[in-house]
Structure formats: C-alpha cells, structure tokens
Swiss-Prot record:
Record-linked PROSITE patterns: AA_TRNA_LIGASE_II (PS50862)
GO molecular function: ATP binding; glycine-tRNA ligase activity; protein dimerization activity
Protein name: Glycine--tRNA ligase
Keywords assigned by UniProt, alphabetized: Aminoacyl-tRNA synthetase, ATP-binding, Cytoplasm, Ligase, Nucleotide-binding, Protein biosynthesis
Organism: Cutibacterium acnes (strain DSM 16379 / KPA171202) (Propionibacterium acnes)
Binding site residues for ATP: 206-208, 216-221, 293-294, 337-340
Transmembrane region(s): none
Gene: glyQS
Reactions accelerated catalytically: tRNA(Gly) + glycine + ATP = glycyl-tRNA(Gly) + AMP + diphosphate
Amino acid sequence: MRTWKKGTAVASTSTLDNVINLCKRRGFVFPCGEIYGGTRAAWDYGPFGVELKENIKRQWWRAMVTRRDDVVGLDSSVILPREVWVASGHVGVFNDPLTECLSCHKRMRADHLQEGHAAKHGIADPDSISLEEVNCPNCGNKGQWTEPRDFNMMLKTYLGPVEDKSGLHYLRPETAQGIFVNFQNVLTSARKKPPFGIAQTGKSFRNEITPGNFIFRTREFEQMEMEFFVEPGTDEEWHQYWIDVRTAWYTDLGINPDNLRHYEHPKEKLSHYSKRTVDVEYKFGFSGSDWGELEGIANRTDFDLGNHSRHSGKDLSYYDQANNKRYLPYVIEPAAGLTRSLMAFMVDAYTEDEAPNAKGGVDKRTVLKLDPRLSPVKAAVLPLSRNSDLSPKARDLAARLREHWNVDFDDAQAIGKRYRRQDEIGTPFCITVDFDSLEDDAVTIRERDTMAQQRVSIDKVEEYLGGKLLGC
C-alpha cells in the first residue's frame, strides 16, 4: 500500500486486508455461489474485476504477441486426451505429499506445513523440519500427523455415456501441453522457425489440497503462458532474456521494483521437466511469508517435445535447412497467473491519502493508483446535478466517449462522494459537466492522482483523453 505523507510512501501491514475488503465492496470479486454458502477458494469476478482482468490480459497479449514478430497465438482445448497427460508426466508425477492431522482429521500438504513452520521460526531449510515439530494450523495439536502420501492434483472427468477408462479425461492443469501437441501445426501454418514462441491464455484446473490467500491459490485459475522454442545450446541465454523481459513487464505497468524479487528453485526441488526455474515473486504480505509467486520462467529443455514424439510416434523435431541439421527444440516457458497478477497490481496501487471536503476540512481518501492501461474505467462523466439541462449534455458526452473507452456515468449523491467512488476503483479521469458548461461549452477534467483540475472545451475532450490514455 502507498500511504502518502510529505511525499513519502510508507508500507502498511493491513494493505492486503484493505484490498480484499475493497474487492468485495466495490464489485471486483465475489465469493462463488454465495447465496448457497459458497465454495471454498472459488471466486466470481464482478463488473470492475472482469474489466481489470481483461485489461491485464490485453497488455500481456500486446507485449508477448502483437508487438513481436517471433510469437504467435493459440487457443487450445481445456479437455485433452488422457494420453497427452501420460506423455507429459502429469499422470505419473503431478503429485503433492498429503498428510492428515490425527486429531481433527484435516488433510494438508506436508511441504506447506514445513514451509510455514520454517517461515515462522526463521529456519532456512524447510526440508530439515520433522512433522513431529509442527502444530496443526486447524486445531493446534502438535506432531500428530499421518505419514505423507502422494496425492494427484489433476481433476478427472468422463466423456460419453459410460464412466469407464475409455472415457477418462482430465481438465488441463496447465495450458502448456495444448501448445506442445500443436507445435508442428503452428510451425507449418504460421511459417515460423526457431527461435519462436506460441502463446495462449486460458483456464486451468488443479485439485489443490490447501487453496487460500484470497484469489492467490485456487482450484480454477487463469494462466498467461508462452512456450518459446530455441536451438539447444542457446537455451540458457534465452532463459535469462525472458527472465529480464517478464520482470520489466510488471514494473512498466506500475509495480514498485522493491516489491519484486527473483527466486531460484533449488535443483532438488525442480519440476520433473525443468533444467532451471526462476520465479518472479511479489511482496504480498501474507501471514507467515511475505512473498508469493507471480510467474515462473522455466527452461523445460526438450522434455515435452521429446516425450510427445515418443508417445505419439510423430516426429516433432525441426530441420534447420541453412545448417543442414535436425534437432528437438528446447523450450523456455514464461508462465504467469492472471489473478495473481491482478492481486499484485491492486495491492501495489492501493493508496490512502487526504482530500479536501465541502466543509473546508479534509477526508481520508482511498485511491487505486493503477496504470491507466489497467484501470477498469478510463473516465467517469459526472453532471453536477440531475438538472434537466445538464443531464442530457453529460449523457451525450459519455456516449461519445464510449466509442473509444469504458466510461462510467454517475449522477447520484454529492460530487465529492462521486469522486471518492471513482478514486476507489482507479478511474484516472473524472469529467464534471456543470452549469458553466451550458454557457461556455466546456467541462472540468479532474486527474485522479494529483486531483488537479483543468477546463477543457467539450469538443476537445476526446483529443485530451486520447493523449493521456495511450496504449489503453
């Protein structure tokens, strides 16, 4: 959170709770199926939440696909043949160690228990901790755990009228495999050659044992992934390139660099497909551990194309005509969580400062200082009152601006309260149509962060906003 006092940003430990409350109050995020009691760690995105999500996806797609000549897009199926997941290794090794408290019978991930205990007690190596030392987070009893057992995290479904092995399929736990099985299709149809990438966004599903931390860890989530195919031997250089590019994307969209760090996965904890993985982490301020993963950038080598070649019998190698050689491309994968990114952008933008009120004093003001490219609403048109002359003029202006941007119209309550509402959802510009507008055909445009106001001719409003909302 940014709380401004004499120009200095001061961190607050309550920022995360404030953002969660704001999300629920202002229609960013709602509990799923709330009228029926809800589903644990499942969330619906309201009017402002869905706009913010779409804006983040749009900026990711522009940065990763449309602004580059070496990356193309794909939209693969959520349900893939079972054989895909056998070949990828997910059926065999996509497991987490699950243990059960003998007192309250709550099941939890053993590694999460160790990591939480290590963070609480300042222990460097979580693996050195025996479960006998760990208290149950649910009931408080110490050391009463079953032996950890592997638990497969993929969600099963059956296609067809009979629930037997022939109809067994899985909801994808990652979007990556849909890209790998389409490698040759894209290679030939898009006329690409390594180094090049295939990107996609979409829903994935994991039967998480311990979901939580609001929208951070859920069983249904949205990914933004790209698989970048390179010649073996160039993979380490490309890996570092994508670590740098992806980190810069977050800071370009307003994340404070001090709230980001890189986490290098220890070799003994690498995923089954990875030669090296570096996470971009954000300082969320979670209980027990401040940091959480935003994005993982992995060097998957030729693991995926090699396995799919062997299991399918199809040759997925690339023939380099210029050098007269054939090879299986290595893969560099930047994989970001969309809702985790949304959460980070909101936490980083959350600000409390002071604003003058109508009585000559000051009130506390909550502001989401989002980059305008991400703001759910780009401008709000606010007639000073519901006067029969002002409202039509204001509505006409709002309709004109909606041809270009997502624009709100609000004529309820005092103008100061309407400003506060727009500040809370991150609207960069408020446009007031007042009684002077009837005479001079001009409006007052207020800027969110500085609260500075400028008089602009009503026929120049689009031009004015166009210069301020570049890239939106």
